[in-house]
Amino acid sequence: MFSWLGNDDRRKKDPEVFQTVSEGLKKLYKTKLLPLEEYYRFHEFHSPALEDADFDNKPMVLLVGQYSTGKTTFIRYLLEQDFPGMRIGPEPTTDSFIAVMQGDVEGIIPGNALVVDPKKPFRKLNAFGNAFLNRFVCAQLPNAVLESISVIDTPGILSGEKQRISRGYDFAAVLEWFAERVDRIILLFDAHKLDISDEFSEVIKALKNHEDKMRVVLNKADQIETQQLMRVYGALMWSLGKIVNTPEVIRVYIGSFWSHPLLIPDNRKLFEAEEQDLFKDIQSLPRNAALRKLNDLIKRARLAKVHAYIISSLKKEMPSVFGKDTKKKELVNNLAEIYGRIEREHQISPGDFPNLKRMQDQLQAQDFSKFQPLKSKLLEVVDDMLAHDIAQLMVLVRQEETQRPVQMVKGGAFEGTLQGPFGHGYGEGAGEGIDDAEWVVARDKPMYDEIFYTLSPVDGKITGANAKKEMVRSKLPNSVLGKIWKLADIDKDGMLDDEEFALANHLIKVKLEGHELPSELPAHLLPPSKRKVAE
């Protein structure tokens, strides 16, 4: 008797088993989170319902910046080819949102056709109306970079009233819609004319719930000298500190992302290193895409729960017959108190609550009599999903990550930075002398030999203790010197001959110049007398 109670309880505790992360996210959303969203009209307040394409699409990169900061040129630099609809110039050229995506043939799909395509993740943009859809296109082209990621180019942010009035649609709301769905948001600034307008500040604030996705690029940095660049960088960090309210510092990449010669080449090495870091960040997106989607679903579930508590609290406070309008105004004005009460009753973090002013504005237009009371079962299902099913999916996420290559984005600008003499760091540090016929250490060997013969060699070798006395003079930590010893002691006899000692000193010099040590000794650094032994 009542055995079905036990079965239901057991079913609730056992998390579902999924084949892929994408399939699991889709099923969890449709069966567990969507019913809660629909019951409390979540989509009217926050974000449209998710579709299959939102879970299946490639990682997307959103570029945001004021006009003429180099957004379109940046995409052209990554792809190493023009894309349909591309316009570049010092004036505000890009007047549309352009989704640059992989396609078999070059072409443009207009916005109205794009939002009815179930395979594209843009169907819910339909809500922004014709004024926006006439300014939204998809540029398709065959390109190796676009096989792994898609890029969203945005119109330059204007100053003054034009930004809000002449566009005909809510620009900040559209950006927020994209920000929820993309994997990386890149804010571009022009180092030559650094200016953060009030409109740009508002846009950055609209993206404030997505700081984890944000990266900053200080572009066109080759147009100013080192001293000016330091001042511009400091000014940018100060300005961002006032707009982005996070204790962590947003990562800023400095460079010149176009294929023209550097105007002031003083900081070439810095630009190359920064470009490599940015490319590595973009290349990691396909590998981390499943984790990002899982993270976004958890974020959405937490907001949906808070929204349910807010709506049900408002419903509970409303009178059944008289004085509804007066009570509605009173509740909207006292929303901060309702937030505080929900926070205390349900132990919810203040960061999970929606923006107070925005919520008040939205509630003004709502009919409170249509709100639903608290339905515990819907919330329990979401709690169960967060506690059990998400943990199961995390295991699957890790499995999928290990099966994927570390750097999945290939082609375009990503290809030229990997190999050959123009690869990053080629011929520098431990790579110095890689193409030379002569052993690179031989240049300084006479100087190292003088030191070697003062360390009392026996049968042409010095002991580890004597070598240590000399090596610690470099003031490098023991962990680094230990690694250098392992690399230099090629025959592993615990002693160093003159060539091995010279090699150890060469590696110390490499480290002192700020380069990383190799994990294994490169072939060109092997002393000539040891090359046959190593083979």
From Swiss-Prot:
Organism superkingdom: Eukaryota
Domain named Dynamin-type G: residues: 55-286
Residues carrying Phosphoserine: 349, 456
Keywords (A to Z) from UniProt: Acetylation, ATP-binding, Calcium, Cell membrane, Cell projection, Cilium, Cilium biogenesis/degradation, Coiled coil, Endosome, Isopeptide bond, Membrane, Metal-binding, Nucleotide-binding, Phosphoprotein, Protein transport, Transport, Ubl conjugation
InterPro entries: DUF5600 (IPR040990), Dynamin_N (IPR045063), EF-hand-dom_pair (IPR011992), EF_Hand_1_Ca_BS (IPR018247), EF_hand_dom (IPR002048), EH_dom (IPR000261), EHD_N (IPR031692), G_DYNAMIN_dom (IPR030381)
Binding site for ATP: 65-72, 220, 258
Membership in a protein family: Belongs to the TRAFAC class dynamin-like GTPase superfamily. Dynamin/Fzo/YdjA family. EHD subfamily.
Designated name of the protein: EH domain-containing protein 3
